[in-house]
């Protein structure tokens, strides 16, 4: 059983938060050093609809920070010049239009507000009928204040909530929903900024496997985390057998090159490839990389591809972001 810890220390406008598994960095969130007009993932804004581009199958909108946003698949030409509510859905390079979406959820510690499924619904992890009945009774007087087009999902963390915690959480959600109103607006406006690192982690704390939380000044120095973080600036990741992988982010995709190093033995390629794919999921997560990923494996027999596919699937299985393995190219990667 791996030991899991959360390390938190003050940093910038908020905190730096690291998830450690067996003393290795497994996830990382760091707040900006200073306030900026950058819209981070999860920010909800009122945007002005500019134009629909048929060839791009989407619509461009104006955002509050003077950048353009892009909504994939949004084709309502009648909304041109209207103000609509969107959420920043992914990190986008500064020279590209920021990808936003009209479909989003608002998470809190015990509930999730959604615009796609009205009514009160429970997480599938809550199987105890008595728990559902207790929560339904507790929130029954508050549900009448929920807008008709809004659904509330009771998270699995509510199962162990103290009396009154779920209803207080729900009341805060309703207050937030009331803020998300673009009626009367004629210009883009930030309606709700995404939570900072510490708030984000503590919000999801009950649903994640955290064993220890350490929050103190200079905690990152005490656990040698800054050294691990500085290593992320290097594209090279060394493996225990002397091999290494090179991870480089381009504008189009993430390139991963696996090398055996000085080992030229018969089993070197397969062993290095297996070690590399086991490490890759962690490296992509702590580097904040995603999207299309192309892996150039060390020379590999076709008969061994099944082993690589299995290890890739296993390595990414616990990632909160679903990863699809598309297959092998004719070039062998």
Regions found by a protein language model. Name each.
Residues 28-35, 60, 66-78, 122-126, ...:
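Beta-strand/loop nucleic-acid-binding surfaces
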Residues 67-68, 118-120, 159-160, 260-263, ...:
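A short, flexible beta-alpha/helix-coil linker loop
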Residues 55, 67-71, 75-78, 85-94:
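Long, basic N-terminal domains or extensions that often function
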Residues 12, 44, 54-56, 65-68, ...:
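A generic structural motif
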């Amino acid at each position: 059983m791996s030991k899991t810890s959360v390390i938190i220390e003050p940093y910038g406008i908020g905190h730096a938060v690291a998830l450690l598994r067996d003393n290795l960095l497994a996830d990382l969130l760091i707040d900006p050093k200073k306030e900026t007009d950058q819209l981070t993932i999860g920010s909800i804004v009122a945007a002005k609809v500019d134009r629909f581009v048929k060839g791009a199958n989407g619509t461009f909108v104006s955002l509050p920070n003077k950048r353009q946003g892009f909504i994939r698949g949004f084709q309502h030409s009648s909304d041109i010049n209207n103000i609509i509510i969107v959420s920043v859905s992914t990190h986008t390079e500064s020279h590209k239009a920021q990808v936003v979406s009209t479909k989003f959820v608002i998470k809190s510690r015990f509930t999730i507000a959604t615009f796609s499924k009205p009514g009160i619904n429970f997480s599938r992890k809550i199987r105890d009928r008595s728990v559902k009945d207790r929560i339904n009774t507790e929130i029954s007087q508050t549900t009448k204040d929920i807008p008709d087009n809004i659904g509330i999902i009771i998270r699995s963390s509510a199962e162990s909530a103290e009396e009154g915690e779920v209803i207080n959480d729900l009341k805060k959600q309703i207050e937030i929903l009331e803020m998300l109103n673009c009626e009367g607006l004629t210009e883009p406006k930030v309606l709700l900024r995404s939570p900072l690192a510490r708030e984000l982690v503590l919000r999801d704390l009950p649903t994640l496997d955290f064993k220890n939380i350490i929050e103190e000044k200079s905690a990152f120095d005490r656990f040698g985390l800054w050294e691990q973080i500085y290593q992320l600036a290097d594209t090279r990741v060394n493996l225990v057998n002397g091999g290494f992988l090179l991870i480089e982010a381009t504008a189009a995709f993430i390139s991963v090159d696996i090398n055996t190093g000085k080992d030229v033995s018969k089993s070197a390629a397969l062993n290095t490839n297996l070690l590399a794919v086991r490490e890759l999921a962690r490296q992509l997560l702590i580097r904040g990389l995603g999207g299309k990923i192309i892996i150039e494996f060390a020379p590999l027999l076709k008969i061994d591809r099944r082993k690589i596919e299995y290890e890739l699937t296993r390595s990414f299985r616990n990632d909160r972001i679903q990863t699809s393995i598309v297959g092998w190219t004719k070039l062998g990667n």
